Amino acid sequence: TRIGAMKGGRTAYMRPETAQGMFMLFPALYRHFRNRLPFGAVQTGKGYRNEISPRQGMIRLREFNMAELEYFIDPDVELNHDFSKWDSVPFSLVPDPEIREPLEMSPGEASSENIIRHPTVAWFMARTWDFLVSVGIDPSKIRFRQHEGTEMAHYASDCWDAEIHGSYGWIECVGIAHRGCYDLSAHESATGDHNLRAWRPFDEPKIVDKTVLSGKGSIIGPSFRDLAGAVNEALDALNQIPTEFPFELSLDNGNQVIIEAEMVEQKRIQATEHGEWFVPHVVEPAFGIDRILWHVLDHAYDETEKAGEAYTVLRLDPSIAAIDVAILPLMEKDGLEEMANDIHRSICSTPNLASYYDGSGSIGRRYARADEVGVPWAVTVDHESMQDGTVTIRRRDDGVQVRIQVDDLVQTLSTGTISSLF
């Protein structure tokens, strides 16, 4: 592409997606998963678009972060996904408007009624919904929109976008596409290599008539000498007869040899087949990380009024808050600051917990500072703490407070059971 809007823009080669590297690595991934389907591979990284006028903050960028999953399946094997978890969860679905009206139904129903054309696409739509809700996206502001026939990518047989409603309206944040065998077949066609395939065993061996390439001994022997046996074995193992000569043949020992047309002949034989090689199909969920992050913040941001002043609360889900708890001594004297610092150090030394200490300003002002950066819990150390070893825990979203023993604080935070105290 050319960077810039004018004809004088510079030529650049930048990937629009991360997926293609995973397709080229299919043979290694297939071996890693012990030559069995289905399996998935995930890659995160940068993607690029030649946007003429980037706008809307993090929504439309020239360079953005993405995470893509390529899930390889056998098209002849029906996968039985369990949708029972979402039976009582109606999803907002917007099928192709040329065919159907918007509707509310569970992913299992949509799959069984062929509104979502492939059950694995429906499965990843459900898992995507779970993920978005778990990071703090409002469930009522999520919908799945099917691509119209004129909008569908050339490689896709079905595609649904997970759209999130925010300050800029409905924005596509995740795309879940059934890519069929397009990518692996395209790479095979371009490279002439046929190793981007998986093996499907037959239930019973089959006797078949087939055309094979057989090496001419009078030419193969003198041409390759010690490698002649390996060349004949590699010719016998070919899955597909090349359409053009000369072609490059890979041997088991890693060598590459060139086969000319006069070195081989085609023969019809009867063979016992125990299985067949096929090109797997792919279902791909692709996540726009920047757009999801922006909507997490957009849905979490809440501005109210307190004592006649604007009061901001960032209602982040505790599982994604950068800081788990604020440690606040009521005042920095009478030993309160030492006790608060001891608690702070104890929390910071615990894996997967983060706290910060704040001792300056009024306690109300310190609560406000914690609320506006999304800290879900605030621990206050007061004079009662010095007497009975308890502290106050304040919940960010409603300001409710309870007391807890200091000795139980770290465990309650680390196990995620703190909400049960309220």
Where are the regions a protein language model picked out?
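Aromatic- and charge-enriched substrate-recognition/interaction segments
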Residues: 356-381, 385-387
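TRNA-recognition modules of translation machinery and tRNA-sensing kinases, especially anticodon-binding
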Residues: 1-358, 384-422
